[in-house]
């Protein structure tokens, strides 16, 4: 925030502004930034290609969306592994630590070959629905990204205007002019220029009076918005330009000191940034990998991600090659940019995000009567974690709601909730609020395969003293069968989760599992298929347990995930086999014993559950492809000791940000 304030007030002295208008404009921009501090994420992994069953080691960089400093306030970051059908394979929750947001995702055994996506976000980022943070990884082969072919539709602000706004980059200056063949442009217009909501110019413009912006006066790099405003500060025309990304970069050097090789064949490698300012430090992640190809144009990196991908509405993950040629000009002409809502902000329409910043984990719910579903006021709710020795108690409010805040425990922690009336009676119904995670509904970045296997037999490291080089060993075994379509009903289902699917996903409850099914939504504990709208109102899907239908108000939390063998979802014409009751869709649950009885469920005032706790970082195991993985390095320079054999056929990749928000990206072969 300090850097943002400095840049904004510095702009006041670099532009010719009307004092009153300028002060109002700046106050509105600052108010919007304070009301809604936006964030961006970037995922750095230990590789780009994997095999089924391997572990993806990762670090998430969480930065302020405006100045790219790591001063964002969210405490948690969520990372999802999405399969080629956009379904969540794994989801982890990372907590802020001294190393940043560091964690891992284990790829399930048996997943199909394909391009998968790592999707990262905070709860605060969910306030923006058209800006996704995606990173492609390839399982079962190598691939590269292709530039997305955007349509010819342009920003809706430009579509109804006959005024031509021209922006020309001429060496070290930007020339801005307006033209309207059908009008003399006698109206009063102003030009407003900003980069990620930081105002860089505001002043009058007219036909025949061009605006010249010098390189030195533009303090930011990335996507620039040039807005033509009328006398009411309403945007008439907007044009986007990708300019001066070097202003956001902090170049670093990696030097291999071969002359200082130690007796154990370790060679120093010095990483430093000569352009660091006073007090500025680096916060980077690093990996050393086997360099089997030098073609990196089909990969994305932190520079293109923060400066381009996350600043364009509905923009997919783009390869770095897009920013190295004139392709970005055409792409921006077909995109819109409303992330920072500047067209509204300059008119005084400042808004706060509907979803608050997540600063602590919360367990909440409602207590109501068994008959009539009336709220129980001043009810007593106990929260117990037997394996952590934790106990807390609270009371319900007038609406019967309760909340436990600051529940920070690792993943897999088990909890027990029980509720009573003020008089200590247990004849109540306890409803638990479940965490909702948005499904990814956007398009998939285009790509192409470059090879079919990620096994690198030629990447064997030098054998240590006394080591033995073994011949290739093949291991054969019978794959266990997990049939998810073992009967006539299941074979006609539109979507099924078998036992292996349930085990690999690790869902904590049935609602979390069902949220992964396309067109299935969960609202207030009820499941709806395709919206569930009928003539007589909104109706949930029918629930069948071991082939027997239960009442609409049946609580699926009564079924423990350890008892579930299969879940089948019927949402199309397949519901006909269930009769009229299946008109709004059917969710069929098959238990392992096959004799589930509603009478055997736990008490209505008690719930045992497991939340999505934070992940505990684990140590890295080096492998032939990535022998070195350092997710968190902080300082002004770094000295690494690496084996001498890394000097050939290995490259080092360093990415991160500085304390001043400058972006670091370096790729180079060691020893060169």
Predicted features and spans:
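Short, acidic Ser/Thr/Gly-rich low-complexity loop/linker segments typical of extracellular
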Residues: 92-96, 204-205, 390-399, 627-635
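Non-catalytic regulatory/gating segments with a bias toward low-complexity or hydrophobic composition
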Residues: 513-514, 566-568, 587-589
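Periplasmic plug
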Residues: 526-571, 593, 597-602, 654
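Acidic glycine/proline-rich low-complexity segments
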Residues: 125-152, 156-162, 238-243, 277-354, ...
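Beta-strand-rich structural segments
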Residues: 39-67, 144-149, 169-179, 226-227, ...
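Short amphipathic beta-strand segments in non-cytosolic proteins
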Residues: 78-89, 192-200, 288-293, 379-393, ...
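Short, polar/charged loop or turn motifs at beta-strand boundaries
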Residues: 489-515, 529-532, 548-550, 593
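Short, acidic, small-residue-rich periplasmic hinge/interaction motif at the N-terminus
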Residues: 444-500, 596-600
